[in-house]
């Protein structure tokens, strides 16, 4: 009876199995190839070409895109074909804006952008607006695209401003503001200011504040927003962030003045965080270090510590260690450890290793271990030594977890060693679980042998079954069925049945039918 209930629950679980996610393959093509696939339309100006597109599309009675290129602001990218990125990302619909650098430190930019307007064929009303990168392959929802060529800035900005101001103020208005901000034109700043001061739509106002920082040269205006106590707090915080993102020289004195004059604690922390992005590194470092050492608000100190590790300075490690040693608040100490990990220096790794071994606070030891794992291959030797010398099982499990984040044959060898060795059961289970996450023939064979052992540790065997269930169904399902049929321990069989129920695999369902029919 118990087994039948388990099987029924397993079958219910099949219906709830999630679909696998797909990933973007970063397909690209020459922008000229993209444009050549569109239908060109002619006209004296942008409005004339929009009318020409309307006339061309009227006979088809299907939604259609009208699209045009424009002069694109430098320092920003839309859906760039990159896999590693450091900076900020903001997504609106199908448009993802990147502001930052590649892994090698190069500014990410995309200059071949176009504004796409999807229209209803009956009313000719715009139902959707996107800014697309012409270097990326797209299907455009299967609708025809009428290409209007390149619009000059004046006609494009005037057209978009009318859309942004039209009622109701909805997603279309917000996309229009984004499109305006992406233009390389001196008039953009005044248009954004107008949205900030007059729009009743808070999303439009917040987006405009963000882009004021990217436009540059607007720190005085942004600082006035931060100081304005009658303004929405979200807008004030966004303005502080925009000052830090502006890359304008001389922003630190402005931020320091705001830090000293603003009374709201949360807003002051936004000001501190903004300093971590400022282009003037020396004054920014001095400002942040002073707050990290002496501000009476521990949350302000923690906020100041976070970005310190990103500064490329010889004295960063020792300054962070002084903060770690002298500050009495646990969260500030944790932030100091995370900042140490970001410095990427051998000296910082040595300090983290020392704390991981010797600190009297177990939570801080574990934090140090986790941050060491973020250092990759450089930390493997220290983590292996730490595991071998450690006596506390919970800390040993933390070391294994940190090691598992590193792609290394030595790490896999260690996981096998621990899984087989005379270690505490919880530690062995941790090693087996982590082996299950490593896709290799060797690890699968080990999990199979462990799960099917007739005289093994039941808890360890159950963990092996769970780990097997995380593998590809081609590997896992036949083995789980075998375990469910033949394992001498009924607890292991039940675990295999539960795991089968979570796979959604037709072979698992057939097995359940077979068993229930008996």
Q: What is the role of each PLM region?
A:
Residues 2-8, 13-172, 182:
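Extended amphipathic alpha-helical repeat scaffolds
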Residues 437-439, 445-466:
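Alpha-helical adaptor scaffolds
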